[in-house]
Amino acid sequence: MNKEKAIVVFSGGQDSTTCLFWAKKKYKEVIAVSFDYNQKHKLELECAKDICKKYNIEHKILDLNLLNQLAPNSLTRQDITVDKSAPKEGVPNSFVDGRNLLFLSFVAVFAKQRGINAIITGVSQSDFSGYPDCRDVFIKSLNVTLNLAMDYEFEILTPLMWINKAETWKMAYDLGVLDIVKEETLTCYNGIKADGCGECPACKLRKKGYLEFEKEYLK
């Protein structure tokens, strides 16, 4: 198994950016892979490009427009607004069916072609917003499936799986990239960089985590 190279599934948001710099500390060579699925806010791809260019990280953008055709929701359609709060039942309307399944599957194909075993993704079960494809059981099962499907030893790593948003901010702080994550990323479901709109579930979770981080760790 190649212990010197890794691929990061990279959206340009808080979690994947934190994972990107975590990977840079751990591996000699890191490749960031982003996906263009004709998402509503293309600014996230621009953020991903800018971060990789600025910090000299190899970046690959894969075309996955088919996902947009199959999964209409508030992140892929201009006429569907993002719910301001999580529904009492079911998944939020920002959930893109199959997204992490397809992202990780295509990244695995790319990784095998490059002789890379480690795949890093920023999913978290602690703050998973009701998304079923952010759960540890899904990641573990997909890891086994990909290994069997391609007769290859992939290792899907999830540095944020069991930590909350405050602890994710703390990780960025410990890595020395707090300002990068705070100012250069896009987490907002309404496509606003840095602190975002302040109203969507992603912004609320990000802000709540930062305030908890400040209170707990920046005394």
Swiss-Prot record:
Keyword ATP-binding: yes
Catalytic activity: 7-carboxy-7-deazaguanine + NH4(+) + ATP = 7-cyano-7-deazaguanine + ADP + phosphate + H2O + H(+)
Pathway: Purine metabolism; 7-cyano-7-deazaguanine biosynthesis
Any one GO molecular function term: zinc ion binding
GO terms under biological process: queuosine biosynthetic process
Reported cofactor(s): Zn(2+)
Record carries keyword Metal-binding: yes
Cofactor info, note text: Binds 1 zinc ion per subunit.
Catalytic activity, EC: 6.3.4.20
Coiled-coil ranges from the UniProt annotation: none
Subunit details: Homodimer.
Protein name as it appears in the record: 7-cyano-7-deazaguanine synthase
Gene name, Swiss-Prot/TrEMBL: queC
